[in-house]
Amino acid sequence: MACTTILVGKDASYDGSTIIARNEDSANGEFCPKRFIVVKPEDQPRKYKSVLSHVEIDLPDNPLQYTAVPNADLKEGIWGEAGVNEANVAMSATETLTTNERVLGADPFVELTPAKGKEGEEGFEPEVAGGIGEEDFLTLVLPYVTTAREGVKRLGALLEEFGTYEMNGVAFSDVDEIWWLETVGGHHWIAKRVPDEAYVTMPNQLGIDEFDLEDAFGEQEDHMCSADLAEFIERNHLDLSVESTTPFNPRDAFGSHSDSDHVYNTPRAWYMQRFLNPYDEQWDGQDADHKPVSDDIPWARQPERKITIEDVKYVLSSHYQGTPYDPYGKLGDQRTRHMFRPIGINRQSQLAVMQIRPYRPQVSRAIQWIAYGSNPFNTLVPFFPNVNSTPKYLEDTTTRVTSENFYWENRIIAALCDSSFADTANAVERYQEKTGAMGHRMVASTDEQIERLVGDVTDEFDAEDEIGDVQPMEPDEIIEAVRNGEAREILAAANENMAAQLKEETDKLLDSVLYTASMNMKNGFHMSDF
């Protein structure tokens, strides 16, 4: 999918949480209705078959419960995209990446080969299944891992065994770590731990720009990779470093620097880092350190201040505000305003922001923030994932257009606001601020209820552990704590209350922008009947 990702290390976030976030965007000319659901262990398949590639995979018999944001129409498969499991591990999959001819020549994609001829007749060739891809990743991995590192290792093993038919970037997080995995060709992969004090920006381009192979084949403190990656690089002359002392650069070896990158990918990384580090360097003009078309914009950077949930929403909604490239702006001209692909684009399906909070009990520390539709016109609101079901307003998305579910209501609002951007901007901003504040209040009040139920967990320990976790536990203990039935009822009630308030405010916004857009219709006239 044509997506945009931001990852925020725990020391770079405003509250010590790990935060992973990604826009899921459809291909140009397509729109994809989404649902927010809970997948229970009994509903998880034991034998999985991909709709697109036809690959069949036997799955373990002990899945964890997890959330997902699948397609409402399953004709092309599940596409679970983002979720949190009962071990408080989050996963976002996938960011479609670019590659180059050298990589694909050395390790081609594993694509579905249809059958030729008719079975039983001379010359018949049976179908050959393809590999795994974005359709499959969340379903195949998230229910079976208890740490972010385990997520990397499980997906890596699946890639080596079954291969893939596309380039993908995948994020995993737990309370302590964030890992970013990038596929390389059909069967290879690399993964790097996001520095705690940094954030990562990822447009649709292979991003990791420095990789320690010695660590990946040794202690694996911050790097992991496929078993034969070093041999693969050497055999195919993929290391483009000029000097032997230069760190290996995967972006040069496995990625791309094409003309299309400079209108579709690099400008997005430029704008996100320009917003989060405005004073670190010169971003504009001929003497800029990095420009929208620069190929060397860093994969990871330390922010100038701590990053909030609202910052994440802003950068993932952005359309180059304050620059000549803003399609809604007054700077520049018609050429510049449509020069680069915006981050907040018309064909956004959903945005999922997964936050794992070390300062709350295991049962309530995970939050999955959700937005549907085009980000400049929607709102991001929190839901607790460790529940038995999700609110119908977000779950019961239909393939039929209706104002009765969150996805379609957002789609309608965005279409109305686009042509009346200036006239509806204030109403949208007020809606975003009000619903965002409602979300933070809901989280705070629910935290208080959970604290009364389970007690102040900080009293159970003499001191916080080395990562600031107030309730450090082994994975089995986390799962047991998260399955507290009474706590789940509290979290589910909070989610339902959030959804009810959200619908009320979204209905009000729809009413407001519909009136404004109707008044701006070209067939209006300033006189009425006498």
Feature roles, as predicted:
Residues G151-E160, V312-L316:
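Short, well-structured alpha-helical segments that form the helix of a local strand-helix-strand
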Residues E231-S364:
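Glycine-rich, aromatic-lined ligand/substrate-binding cores of catalytic
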Residues L138-Y144:
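Short, well-ordered beta-strand elements within core beta-sheets of diverse protein domains
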